Amino acid sequence: MKAVVFAYHDIGCTGIEALLEAGYEIQAVFTHADDPSENRFFGSVAQLCAEHGLPVYSPEDVNHPLWVEHIKGLAPQALFSFYYRHMLKQEILDIPSAGAFNLHGSLLPAYRGRAPINWCLVNGEQLTGITLHQMTMRPDAGAIVAQQAVAIKWADTALTLHGKVRLAAKALLDAELPKLRTGDISLTPQDESRASYYGRRTPADGELHWDKSARDLYNLVRAVTQPYPGAFSFAGDRKLTVWKATHIAQDSDMLPGTILSQDPLRIACGEGVLEIVAGQAEGGLYVRGAQLARELGLVAGMRLGAKASSALRKERLTRVLILGVNGFIGNHLTERLLKDGRYEIYGLDISASALGRFIDHPHFHFVEGDISIHTEWIEYHIKKCDVILPLVAIATPIEYTRNPLRVFELDFEENLKIVRYCVKYNKRIIFPSTSEVYGMCDDHSFDEDESRLIVGPIHKQRWIYSVSKQLLDRVIWAYGKKEGLNFTLFRPFNWMGPRLDSLDSARIGSSRAITQLILNLVDGTPIQLVDGGAQKRCFTDIEDGIEALFRIIENKGNRCDGQIINIGSPDNEASILQMAEVLLGKFEAHPLRHHFPPFAGFKRVESKSFYGDGYQDVSHRRPSIKNARRLLDWEPTIEMEETIGKTLDFFLQGAVSTGVEHD
């Protein structure tokens, strides 16, 4: 059987050797060039291929059309991925006649994503393993071919566990590869209810937080000890790395991080005591814990913790400037940031109608104003704040055709000024792009880094919003590349929930779909389905969306710098008609139903009569959320039906309280 292989690491070498032993004809191997900054403790796929005379490549973009055509020309019957670090596009996965298969270092569906061996140890698991599964565009989500379990012992480190998993991988492949050749395999779909996903780890994730239990800290030490960067802490500003430790079930009345003794070097934790068996001062040697204590002058009563200079800096709250703070996203984001307690919010908007619950908060500062007028205030606060979120935009479809020039002036020209202030004062900008930039993209799911951005002809003015946002995306990207602007672009996919628009805005047609439909129910007018409501969207609960946006602001390990991130819920895909039917069902069952007129039915209308000349719609808009999973460790959790119920309840409560009801 002919095979193309994507491989890296020891597991990659193991996979190639297993294929050769099973009689597969390997036509090409794709791997990664070694990263000089990485401590490479594993075998070289490139070297192994050279020894076996296999053609090996390391393209910068294996999904480039030239490489796709090259792989098609090889006509492989099977494709294998063994610890290859890049996602493969569907176009490549569709090439092999017998399928594409990946080897993942966990017992799926648990521990999808990056660094599963390290994460298993961090979480104190007692069992992991290796899984051979079909490849899909969703990472590690395809049907399972076979699994082999590996027991985790208390003394295991990431290195020893990796060795066990490698041996399990060899045994699994030896058993399954002959079956794959003959087609004698059975596939088991993954149980999504048991799925978990973990993102990449960075050296910063190794910091020891002494308020945790000694058991948890021991697990962290063994998860990141050599050859990984190691767990670490600080004595003042002096860094020490803990390479080996043990935990002691001993109570202590000392504050977490307090040194209890020098020899042995023992530290009080939130629960129990951690003994540092071996460690290393920055620039020093690997030594026993007692010697490390002497070298750093550590004595009983001193405390370890965060770097002293960093801790002092962290005492100041992070200042966040939100322009458009009264809007749907700005309002919910303010609530989330203030709840966290580490942020001070400066907000500007033309109204404070939804801000009453924040006005008296000591960390919330609001000015009523227009971004096109209050330019001096904006420039001063951009200079003053740490993170800038310009959320002001016209984002309702009817305005794209009704007021295209106003859309351009506000959404592009005014926001470009803000971008340039951020460049001038070297400030981090988190810019709200939009799912609209993908336009009529024909991909199954829209990928931030790969999908084409396709819009209609010039006379279709509805695209002025999309291209205004897209051009700003490109300008921000260019400023990042050429002038060092620190940015993140996020693209919301049909976020909805309480406070989305208002019934008054819906009355003049200037609202999003669900608000318009709720108005029809409240007023007793027919629900208007533009072009029959067949258009599909992926509806995302505002709570899920805000949690992802909060993590972008938090930016652990600076992972979000220079990134584009879709934020949406692919599993909540439904047509506008389906959404309307769910909404109607919840409306009829609502305790306030008797306040409103009878349901007036559905009415199909043409888009031209509803939106006017220049409108053009798209059939589907489904996000790839691989970047959100990888960078934010985020997954949407709330189903569309729940979101519709919350949104409906908010507007019905408001309508009854203001007297907008049926007599």
Curated annotation (Swiss-Prot):
UDP-alpha-D-glucuronate binds at residues 395, 400, 434-435, 462, 494, 528-537, 615. The record marks 102 as: Transition state stabilizer. Transmembrane segments: none annotated. Residues 316-663 are annotated as: Dehydrogenase ArnADH. One of its GO terms (cellular component) is membrane. It catalyses: UDP-alpha-D-glucuronate + NAD(+) = UDP-beta-L-threo-pentopyranos-4-ulose + CO2 + NADH; UDP-4-amino-4-deoxy-beta-L-arabinose + (6R)-10-formyltetrahydrofolate = UDP-4-deoxy-4-formamido-beta-L-arabinose + (6S)-5,6,7,8-tetrahydrofolate + H(+). Residues 1-304 are annotated as: Formyltransferase ArnAFT. (6R)-10-formyltetrahydrofolate binds at residues 114, 136-140. One of its GO terms (molecular function) is carboxy-lyase activity. One of its GO terms (biological process) is lipopolysaccharide biosynthetic process. Pathway: Nucleotide-sugar biosynthesis; UDP-4-deoxy-4-formamido-beta-L-arabinose biosynthesis; UDP-4-deoxy-4-formamido-beta-L-arabinose from UDP-alpha-D-glucuronate: step 1/3; Nucleotide-sugar biosynthesis; UDP-4-deoxy-4-formamido-beta-L-arabinose biosynthesis; UDP-4-deoxy-4-formamido-beta-L-arabinose from UDP-alpha-D-glucuronate: step 3/3; Bacterial outer membrane biogenesis; lipopolysaccharide biosynthesis. It holds the Pfam family Formyl_trans_C. PANTHER family: BIFUNCTIONAL POLYMYXIN RESISTANCE PROTEIN ARNA, UDP-D-APIOSE_UDP-D-XYLOSE SYNTHASE 2. Homohexamer, formed by a dimer of trimers. Bifunctional enzyme that catalyzes the oxidative decarboxylation of UDP-glucuronic acid (UDP-GlcUA) to UDP-4-keto-arabinose (UDP-Ara4O) and the addition of a formyl group to UDP-4-amino-4-deoxy-L-arabinose (UDP-L-Ara4N) to form UDP-L-4-formamido-arabinose (UDP-L-Ara4FN). The modified arabinose is attached to lipid A and is required for resistance to polymyxin and cationic antimicrobial peptides. In the N-terminal section; belongs to the Fmt family. UDP-L-Ara4N formyltransferase subfamily. This is Bifunctional polymyxin resistance protein ArnA. It comes from Aeromonas salmonicida (strain A449). The gene is arnA.
